[in-house]
């Protein structure tokens, strides 16, 4: 299984799993097939929130940051709404001087 596991850049209580090839567990690959480049696992029954990012296509560092910030937005706002996560992610990236990554989210047109 090839995954990079680390603590989130912006929240020490959130784990990030970066999938780098097709040998990741099937339930993780199925989640990515349904959700796209990333998804967040959080809620009442989840002790440690997890962000899963699909990096099988060699994303740029700014793309990885944009995905992480967006998914962290779902966790921090406790919202399934894409607009809530996107606005949180853009604000987080801007506040941390990562305008190029924020621009990636802005260019998606979610907000």
Regions found by a protein language model. Give the residues of each.
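Acidic surface patches and DE-rich sequence motifs
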Residues: 8, 45, 94
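Active-site scaffold of zinc-dependent metalloenzymes
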Residues: 19-62, 75
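Active-site recognition of the HExxH zinc-binding catalytic motif
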Residues: 66-78
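Hydrophobic beta-strand residues in large extracellular and virion-surface proteins
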Residues: 14-17, 51-53, 68-69, 85
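Alpha-helical scaffolds flanking conserved acidic
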Residues: 61-66, 84
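Zn2+-dependent metallopeptidase catalytic core
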Residues: 1-13
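Post-HExxH zinc-binding segment in Zn-dependent metallohydrolases
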Residues: 79-111
